[in-house]
A protein has these predicted regions:
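N-terminal export/targeting and maturation segments
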Residues: 21-81, 152, 182
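Short beta-strand elements
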Residues: 30, 103, 175-209
């Protein structure tokens, strides 16, 4: 009988440890080693100005990305938008809204032969009738520093403090192969420490820039 009790206690202890580990993982920021997954040795690094947090980047061959099912796309998008609040960077619209990009293959810097960006801008509130806007554009070549892109407000603004979510897709070609690297970032006009609970409704909505 005593042996059975000890076995039961051991099982309960192991289950408790496993559950605690699961909670710790589920409510922790995405670890660095999972923030940038590559393919064919091709890697894109992205930096959001004024924010030291690294985005969560997933890189695909273009043909593989196009072949993803809706469920696979949903899982990928859920990954790049972060595991917990504060897990991904936020572009500061009132402080120089820039993103910077560099590329490498086999751990050596490379310059893509072709490059463009596609942004899916998701309105934060329910008021905006257009929930998602799609923006396609070119990136600025910064020479040896890579490429940059300046964002702007893409959704309709109803309150003093504004926030929206962007899923960026960078389309580029390296050694004749087409790739897509995608990541998520927020962007808003609030300074550090801004409380959105103290927001104020604007007299009239402000249209996207």
């Amino acid at each position: 009988m005593r042996k059975k009790i000890l076995i039961a206690l051991g099982i309960l202890f192991a289950a408790g440890v496993a559950f605690a580990a699961f909670l710790s993982y589920a409510f922790s920021p995405t670890p660095d080693f999972r923030r940038n997954e590559t393919v064919d040795g091709v890697r894109m690094d992205a930096v959001v100005a004024w924010d030291e947090r690294k985005p969560i980047i997933r890189t695909f061959r273009e043909k593989d990305y196009r072949a993803l099912t809706e469920n696979q796309l949903a899982t990928m998008r859920d990954t790049v938008d972060g595991g917990i609040e504060g897990d991904i960077p936020c572009i500061k619209l009132n402080k120089g809204p820039k993103m910077f990009f560099q590329f490498e293959k086999a751990e050596k810097p490379v310059k893509p032969e072709k490059i463009s960006i596609k942004i899916l801008a998701h309105a934060w509130g329910d008021d905006d009738p257009e929930k998602t806007r799609i923006i396609t554009d070119v990136l600025k070549d910064e020479g040896d520093l890579g490429f940059s892109y300046t964002t702007k407000r893409y959704s309709r603004q109803y309150e003093k403090y504004f926030l929206e979510y962007l899923q960026a897709e960078v389309h580029y070609t390296v050694d004749g192969e087409n790739y897509i690297s995608t990541f998520g970032t927020f962007q808003g006009n609030g300074d550090d420490g801004t409380s959105f609970f103290e927001n104020e409704e604007l007299p009239a909505p402000v249209e996207p820039e």
